[in-house]
From Swiss-Prot:
GO terms for molecular function: GTP binding; GTPase activity; methionyl-initiator methionine tRNA binding; translation initiation factor activity. It comes from Danio rerio. Residues 457-469 are annotated as: Interacts with cdc123. Disruption phenotype: Morpholino knockdown of eif2s3 produces morphants characterized by hypomotility and morphological deficits at 2 dpf. They are shorter with a curved tail. They also display a significant reduction of head size and small eyes. This is Eukaryotic translation initiation factor 2 subunit 3. Residues 39-247 form the tr-type G domain. Eukaryotic translation initiation factor 2 eIF2 is a heterotrimeric complex composed of an alpha (EIF2S1), a beta (EIF2S2) and a gamma (EIF2S3) chain. eIF2 is member of the 43S pre-initiation complex (43S PIC). The lineage of its organism: Eukaryota, Metazoa, Chordata, Craniata, Vertebrata. Belongs to the TRAFAC class translation factor GTPase superfamily. Classic translation factor GTPase family. EIF2G subfamily. Residues 225-227 are annotated as: G5. The keyword Nucleotide-binding applies. It is found in: Cytoplasm, Cytosol.
């Protein structure tokens, strides 16, 4: 891997050089040039009804197609979380009118490049590096959004101009934003090229009425066409000026939630050339460094002869870090970070490590097998199309011994309700999970053959298991 011997990044010479020997974590900010040159530091979720153009908008801004999997391309829907990074630039020529002075490019573009707008001079300079978390627009999304597998700082809410507003999932997503307490929202009225001006104005009124009284009230509404890249620079301007730079914790022990993992070795590879497994995820806090020792919890889960769950955390070392195609020497919170490790690649292949937590040795939270939560149920089922003027089905109370799907971090696992009181419930988990008291979890119930979000909860306490560690 480039540059892991010398402690400086050798890949991408046109980007800012990172040097581990001079790194002072306490001086870093989400706008430090050495970080935003190579990785994103602000996460923006794209949400909205299916086929309203979320992935297309991300592609228009970043140049990255987030739909990477074959079955997604065929069905034209996003199934897994897609991440795409984009650098936002501003021209340093004051005579250039806004919004033309803003521009977005892919994450490996140089930090400065000369203007190509006739009649202007100067350079485009990097001002933000954002990561778009392109969520699948269905129920999975709800769970993914709620359980904080991705730290989201802001959201782009997409509404297609050629359909009436609101569509069922749009209201569901607004509910999720409310629950997550996301305050910074931009509403994009997409597909504006398909409608007449009068229709666009009429829908603008509908959108205003729809967001009234919600967390999105007062959010700017920008008419765009993602396919024609119309008004995309306006979106860039709003990203720079309307979304405040988040406060990040760079000094704590690092922690990363794994949302993807893979084996990068090709079949038939020589034994000496084998590379360790790669885990991808979003860093919640702290800074990961190349060469650092790391621990993954819960690790390898098995049952002993009595059928009790056992966990064996995995210990390893970071050999490389990267964000999209950029090599890193250290990685901060924001965007999807790939962590190259020395872990046995078979443990990582095909997303096997999803739901695990990776961090500094000895600094990770407890492993729980049972949780006691205080929970809140939604009044009605969301996102279910209702006939005519019928109200959506009410959410039934939790009952003892029913099985729910629980989403914690990036882990989805079954959970049996073992006891339930007014607003407290005890849940026995099918798989152990590494988490801590105070974390939010999402609860889903099987309704008509689909998992539907019914509420969310917060961990109050639980039953933990002591991980087993080999003495060798």
């Amino acid at each position: 891997m480039a540059g892991d011997e010398s402690g400086t990044t050798l890949g991408q010479p046109h980007l800012y050089k990172q040097d581990l020997s001079t790194l002072d974590v306490s001086k870093l900010t989400p706008l430090s040039q050495e970080i935003i040159s190579r990785q994103a530091t602000i996460n923006i979720g794209t949400i909205g009804h299916v086929a309203h153009g979320k992935s297309t908008v991300v592609k228009a801004i970043s140049g990255v197609h987030t739909v990477r999997f074959k079955n997604e391309l065929e069905r034209n829907i996003t199934i897994k979380l897609g991440y795409a990074n984009a650098k936002v630039y501003k021209l340093d020529d004051p005579s250039c009118p806004r919004p033309e002075c803003y521009r977005s490019c892919g994450s490996s573009t140089p930090d400065e490049f000369p203007t190509d707008i006739p009649g202007t001079k100067g350079n485009f300079k990097l001002v933000r590096h954002v990561s778009f978390v392109d969520c699948p627009g269905h129920d999975i999304l709800m769970a993914t959004m709620l359980n904080g597998a991705a730290v989201m700082d802001a959201a782009l809410l997409l509404i297609a101009g050629n359909e009436s507003c609101p569509q069922p999932q749009t209201s569901e997503h607004l509910a999720a934003i409310e629950i997550m307490k996301l305050k910074h929202i931009l509403i994009l009225q997409n597909k504006i090229d398909l409608v007449k001006e009068s229709q666009a104005k009429e829908q603008y009124e509908q959108i205003l009425a729809f967001v009234q009284g919600t967390v999105a009230e007062g959010a700017p509404i920008i008419p765009i066409s993602a396919q024609l890249k119309y008004n995309i620079e306006v979106v860039c301007e709003y990203i720079v000026n309307k979304i405040p730079v988040p406060v990040r914790d760079f000094t704590s022990e690092p922690r990363l939630i794994v949302i993807r993992s893979f084996d990068v070795n090709k079949p038939g590879c020589e034994v000496d050339d084998l590379k360790g497994g790669v885990a991808g995820g979003s860093i919640l806090k702290g800074v990961l460094k190349v060469g650092q020792e790391l621990e993954v919890r819960p690790g390898i889960v098995s049952k002993d002869h009595e059928g009790k769950l056992m966990c064996k955390p995995i210990f390893s070392k970071i050999v490389s870090l990267f964000a999209e195609h950029n090599d890193l020497q250290y990685a901060a919170p924001g965007g999807l970070i790939g962590v190259g490790t020395k872990i046995d690649p078979t443990l990582c292949r095909a997303d096997r490590m999803v739901g695990q937590v990776l961090g500094a040795v000895g600094a990770l939270p407890e492993i729980f097998t049972e949780l006691e939560i205080s929970y809140f149920l939604l009044r009605r089922l969301l996102g279910v199309r209702t006939e005519g003027d019928k109200k959506a089905a009410k959410v039934q109370k939790l009952s003892k011994n029913e099985v729910l799907m629980v989403n914690i971090g990036s882990l989805s696992t079954g959970g049996r309700v073992s006891a339930v009181k007014a607003d407290l419930a005890k849940i026995v988990l099918t798989n152990p999970v590494c988490t801590e008291v105070g974390e939010k979890i999402a609860l889903s119930r099987r309704v008509e053959k689909h998992w539907r979000l019914i509420g969310w909860g917060q961990i109050r306490r639980g039953v933990t298991i002591t991980p087993t560690v080999d003495d060798d």
